[in-house]
């Protein structure tokens, strides 16, 4: 059970000390309130000049080793069905409970169909694909065994994990937020330090509520000026990635700032932080301000009453100090940003809609020239081709990047009173059940269906195609998702990343088109802020202060016993050969494609490792030029791949 509770003032002052043991600190970082650690700062101390990232990081460091590795406390843990099965298995094997069930929120999103649920009975009968069904069933079994809060498919609050956290107020400023998912960076829009973790780390957080991490560098991207007509946050972040590249933020936490960012809504800020991963960063952050506070004010898990006032006072202190130092500074002029889209197979392959594809013959660097040619060959567009007018087969409006109510309103404003091109299959997938219900109250669903767009249920859908929503080989899609890698939305599928308005325009015209040339309707009755979310029974509000004894005495579910634990086995030490891979910013999709993620077993990477690079996707034949396939390398096992 997740509760919104408060901290007594005398406990909060102890958070100023860094020499407390983990268990002692944990009694103060209670439930969902370490987010707004009610610092009264009554104990004098020296305030260093710090960035937003510095402040949140420093407040969560429990211990630091000589090499800089830190043990940090984790405030929020979001869980879904794909990256959690092996983590729960590890807890069972060690006979451990989840340390903080009240700080953990789970849902299903990646594998589930987004077709109508009018006849939904249970996951077993609803999900037809066996591996997807198994992962979802396994999550439900683990939720029951370990006593966690769960938004299942029959729950109106179910949705994409990075949509439901913010709309419930589970995500709050100054928290550390993790999830076994790359796009956890979304939550940084609230001034939280949010980043994706691997399955082994998921297990570590479930067991200890801590992580071992090294501090990243500070990077500031300041966007100044008023955004031009037709330009959205999606265009801004695509432009930024085009400027700095997909490796530009490597090793950094990016703080997005400037008057352009300050003028954005929370939904828009979430879209930008969501794609900071595509810029190579560990996380993206925006300092909390009045826009943040107004968004959070009525959320079910936000502080209430006097706690709210104290929380806001603390949150306001998080902004980077005027003289704070950054390792990297980037300045962007908003006047330089037009409606932007991708032309190739990397988020850095961007041009304005008025631009054209590049010409490899004009690129001097041989590695870059080869990459551009490969991208053009895959995407099926010739060099120097104008992007406007490229025919599309499908339109996808959804994903954790662009599936919130603001995104749907923007798309509906373009679609209203028009019809989709007859050859286009267009789908709109709300990010959560609450977003879907709000859109239906506003009549957005009817606008879409009247135009021939398919109105779906909440889920990740076509963003990565682990569910039935996939592109067929050769199909071209205007997509509001975050990644356009080869095969991302389906084997052989071709993806162009665009804003919701640009996707809607492509659906109407049947081709990539400049939304600025489209008639855009007013959507009557649309509130400026996101809808107020109702507080439901599963969330308890507790106004009284909670002392430390009541925290550890709360019931915690214990997994089924597996007998006496034999203790943790000794670590295996591996030594081997480091093979060079001349590719920048290697992403998780490249390391292990999505089709190999549908397992609940600890299988290792095996044949999945760099599958798209090691094998021809059409024939399955081994690529003799890939580094791990070279016969000159000694016989070894590579991360689970045996090379004989």
From Swiss-Prot:
Cofactor: [4Fe-4S] cluster
Record keywords, A-Z: 4Fe-4S, Amino-acid biosynthesis, Branched-chain amino acid biosynthesis, Iron, Iron-sulfur, Leucine biosynthesis, Lyase, Metal-binding
A GO term, aspect molecular function: metal ion binding
Biological process (GO), any one: L-leucine biosynthetic process
Binding locations of [4Fe-4S] cluster: 400, 460, 463
Catalyzed reaction equations: (2R,3S)-3-isopropylmalate = (2S)-2-isopropylmalate
Gene3D superfamilies reported in the protein's UniProt record: Aconitase, domain 3, Aconitase, domain 4
CDD domains: IPMI
Domain of life: Eukaryota
Enzyme Commission code(s) on record: 4.2.1.33
Alphabetized PROSITE patterns for the sequence: ACONITASE_1, ACONITASE_2
Entry-linked InterPro entries: 3-IsopropMal_deHydase_lsu, Acnase/IPM_dHydase_lsu_aba_1/3, Acoase/IPM_deHydtase_lsu_aba, Aconitase/3IPM_dehydase_swvl, Aconitase_4Fe-4S_BS, Aconitase_4Fe-4S_dom, AconitaseA/IPMdHydase_ssu_swvl, IPM_dehydratase_rel_enz
Pathway per the UniProt entry: Amino-acid biosynthesis; L-leucine biosynthesis; L-leucine from 3-methyl-2-oxobutanoate: step 2/4
Region listing for Disordered, in residue ranges: 521-568
Group of enzyme by EC: lyase
UniProt biased composition (Acidic residues): 537-547
Cofactor binding, per record: Binds 1 [4Fe-4S] cluster per subunit.
Subunit structure of this chain's protein: Monomer.
Purpose: Catalyzes the isomerization between 2-isopropylmalate and 3-isopropylmalate, via the formation of 2-isopropylmaleate.
Family, as annotated: Belongs to the aconitase/IPM isomerase family.
The protein's name: 3-isopropylmalate dehydratase
Gene source species: Mucor circinelloides f. lusitanicus
């Amino acid at each position: 059970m997740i509760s919104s509770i408060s901290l007594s003032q005398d406990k909060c002052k102890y958070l100023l000390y860094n020499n407390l043991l983990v268990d002692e600190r944990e009694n103060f970082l209670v439930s969902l309130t370490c987010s707004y650690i009610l610092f009264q700062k009554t104990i004098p101390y020296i305030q260093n000049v710090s960035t937003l990232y510095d402040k949140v990081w420093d407040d969560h460091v429990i211990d630091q080793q000589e090499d800089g590795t830190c043990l940090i406390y984790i405030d929020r843990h979001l869980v879904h069905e794909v990256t959690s099965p092996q983590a729960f298995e590890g807890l069972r094997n060690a006979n451990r409970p989840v340390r903080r069930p009240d700080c953990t929120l789970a849902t299903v999103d990646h594998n589930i169909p987004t077709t109508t649920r009018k006849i939904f009975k249970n996951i077993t009968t609803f999900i037809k694909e066996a591996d997807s069904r198994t992962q979802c069933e396994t999550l439900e079994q683990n939720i029951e065994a370990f006593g966690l809060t769960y938004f299942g498919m029959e729950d109106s609050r179910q949705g994409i994990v990075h949509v439901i956290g913010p709309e419930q107020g589970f995500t709050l400023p100054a928290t550390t937020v993790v999830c076994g998912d790359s796009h956890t960076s979304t939550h940084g829009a609230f001034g939280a330090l949010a980043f994706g973790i691997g399955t082994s780390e998921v297990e570590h957080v479930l067991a200890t509520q801590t992580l071992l991490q090294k501090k990243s560098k500070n990077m500031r991207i300041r966007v100044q000026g008023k955004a031009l007509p037709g330009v959205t946050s999606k265009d801004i972040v695509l432009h930024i990635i085009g400027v700095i590249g997909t490796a530009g933020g490597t090793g950094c936490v990016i703080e997005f700032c400037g008057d352009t960012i300050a003028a954005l809504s929370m939904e828009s800020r979430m879209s930008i932080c969501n794609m900071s991963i595509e810029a190579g960063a560990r996380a993206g952050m925006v300092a909390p301000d009045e826009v943040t506070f107004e968004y959070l004010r009525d959320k079910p898990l936000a502080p209430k009453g006097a706690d709210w006032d104290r929380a806001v006072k603390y949150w306001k202190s998080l902004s980077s100090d005027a003289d704070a130092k950054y390792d990297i500074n980037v300045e962007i002029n908003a006047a330089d940003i037009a409606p932007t889209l991708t032309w190739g197979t990397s988020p850095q392959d961007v041009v304005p809609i008025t631009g054209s594809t590049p010409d490899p013959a004009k690129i001097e660097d041989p590695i870059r020239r080869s990459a551009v040619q490969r991208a053009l060959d895959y995407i099926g567009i010739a060099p120097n081709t104008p992007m406007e007018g490229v025919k599309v087969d499908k339109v996808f409006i959804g994903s954790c990047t662009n599936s919130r109510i603001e995104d749907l309103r923007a798309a509906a404003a373009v679609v209203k009173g028009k019809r989709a091109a007859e050859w286009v299959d267009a789908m709109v997938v709300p990010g959560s059940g609450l977003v879907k219900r709000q859109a239906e109250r506003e009549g957005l669903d009817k606008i879409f269906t009247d135009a021939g767009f398919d109105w779906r249920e909440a889920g990740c859908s076509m963003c990565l195609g682990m569910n039935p929503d996939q592109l067929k080989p050769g199909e071209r899609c205007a997509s509001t998702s975050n990644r356009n890698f080869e095969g991302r939305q389906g084997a052989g599928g071709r993806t162009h990343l665009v804003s919701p308005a640009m996707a809607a325009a492509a659906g109407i015209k049947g081709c990539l088109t400049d939304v600025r040339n489209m008639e855009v309707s007013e959507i009557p009755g649309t509130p400026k802020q996101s809808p107020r979310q109702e507080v439901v029974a599963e969330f308890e509000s507790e106004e009284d202060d909670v002392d430390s004894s009541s925290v550890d005495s709360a019931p915690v579910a214990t997994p089924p016993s597996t007998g006496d634990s034999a203790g943790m086995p000794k670590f295996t030490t591996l030594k081997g050969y480091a093979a060079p891979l001349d590719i920048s910013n290697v992403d998780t999709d490249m390391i292990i494609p999505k089709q190999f993620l549908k397992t609940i077993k600890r299988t290792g990477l095996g044949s999945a490792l760099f599958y798209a690079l090691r094998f021809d996707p059409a024939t399955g034949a081994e690529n003799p030029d890939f580094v791990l396939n070279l016969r000159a390398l000694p016989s070894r096992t590579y991360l689970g791949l045996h090379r004989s």
